[in-house]
């Protein structure tokens, strides 16, 4: 199993069954992992497609997968970190319904797993600002996506 990256928070979320439609909790401002609200957005990814690598210098990500299944991979290249040079991966879905909080300064990429729609919600700590993030091509950080 991958080692949990320093600063990552994994929070189990409530799902409430209701005969007219289920309720999926996301985040409260009193939750661990809430570092302010900048914006919330949804993003979809097709099966076996991969988006990333991206590193934020100001934005904390809070990722939830209410539809489909997505594998998230985090890589820590922070020299001062106890988890320097480690990877952490997790698949989130309705069956593994959790919020993944990703701190600033680590690399993140994700892959669509389900045949149907794979959708994530990011509850971001700041509004989108393209100058606070760095990107790399997938082959610049070596990770075995085929497991």
Regions found by a protein language model. Name each.
Residues 1-96, 113-147:
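Non-catalytic, conserved peripheral segments adjacent to functional cores
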Residues 100, 108-113:
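Short beta-strand His + acidic residue motifs that chelate non-heme Fe in jelly-roll/DSBH
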């Amino acid at each position: 199993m991958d080692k949990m990256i320093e600063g990552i928070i994994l929070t189990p979320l409530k799902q409430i069954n209701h005969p007219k439609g289920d309720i999926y909790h996301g985040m409260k401002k009193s939750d661990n992992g809430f570092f302010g609200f900048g914006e919330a957005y949804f993003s979809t990814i097709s099966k076996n497609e991969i988006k990333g690598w991206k590193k934020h210098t100001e934005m904390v990500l809070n990722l939830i997968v209410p539809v489909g299944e997505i594998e998230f991979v985090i890589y820590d290249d922070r020299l001062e970190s106890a988890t320097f040079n480690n990877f952490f991966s997790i698949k989130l879905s309705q069956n593994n319904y959790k919020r993944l909080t990703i701190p600033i300064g680590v690399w993140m990429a994700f892959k669509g797993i389900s045949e149907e729609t794979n959708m994530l919600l990011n509850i971001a700590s700041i509004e989108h600002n393209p100058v606070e993030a760095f990107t790399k091509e997938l082959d610049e950080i070596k990770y075995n996506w085929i497991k």
